[in-house]
């Protein structure tokens, strides 16, 4: 048995680098006041908790997170959630883009982000770099990914998912030979170019039946690089800014690029619609495609020590409710409510993600706000909300209707406190929606 086949030794010499993304334009306005990895998820987590938890469960504990803008809340979350003991070398550290004399620009892409901090990564005595994305929802054992990389003596290994004819045109596809080596790339091909990218996915371990239904493989944007290979490629292609579109396809002819099949739930949640759908899919019965209820590979986050949720004479169906909520005489269906959510009486919440609050307001504080004609945090009585995302600390008044009654697909109403994306109303963090408002 090779020494690295022991799980602990297998990943000890791996450094994880999580790419937090750019300005988060696809998730705006959820990224207006926070970095993309800090966007709340599933009522109590944040996007960054997914790749960090996968790393910890895979015993990879040297982790950097690269981010671009608004990193204050991300820094705070990381420092409170992942403070490793001083008796081991594990860490999770946020590295924000810096403008220097040598690098006057922000990160220009995935490869550029890594290039700008290569001086720091070089200091670590490791064999591989594990490059991860910060806006995907999945559960993966990276130790098996690294093992495949070493067994095939790959220079770069790409994690891939099998996809069908419907999804393939929207993804970056690749072709492989009989040994699983990647031979060709195509970004979002159509028509004949799409059909030319069909491969026998049974080569990577799919059953014949599944391989027939999923004749394409798509990149997940997750890579293992040999240390020196990454250094050399970033220097060779010094003008290239993106791994998936430039550096990796350009290196295929003279490097051993291997595919590692991931045949489980994986979702890119980097857009408002995908993020919304993935959150509500967690309520699916009897079991969702992705579950946070997995003791063998838990998803970690910051411990908050909140009290249990209180529900008074309410009807709640097909929903997830975070800790510390107060729900009074209302109806909630197919929704996710985040921590400290407060829903007053006679409300109807359907097909909605409510992110909750960062704080509680005492009864006296709420009475004072009411006396001044102001609106308390939470959702006021008699309000109806359907197909929406309510960001944190929103103050929604009484008898408000957030239902997109005109079925508008896209709208920018920042001055009024909301956007509409793909027909989903997104109420901005910290805004106030007046009593009786109809959206």
Curated annotation (Swiss-Prot):
Residues that bind alpha-D-glucose 1-phosphate: 172, 187-188, 219
Catalyzed reactions per annotation: alpha-D-glucose 1-phosphate + ATP + H(+) = ADP-alpha-D-glucose + diphosphate
Entry keyword Transferase: yes
Keyword vocabulary terms for this entry: ATP-binding, Carbohydrate metabolism, Glycogen biosynthesis, Glycogen metabolism, Nucleotide-binding, Nucleotidyltransferase, Transferase
Complex and partners: Homotetramer.
The family this protein is said to belong to: Belongs to the bacterial/plant glucose-1-phosphate adenylyltransferase family.
Protein name stated in the entry: Glucose-1-phosphate adenylyltransferase
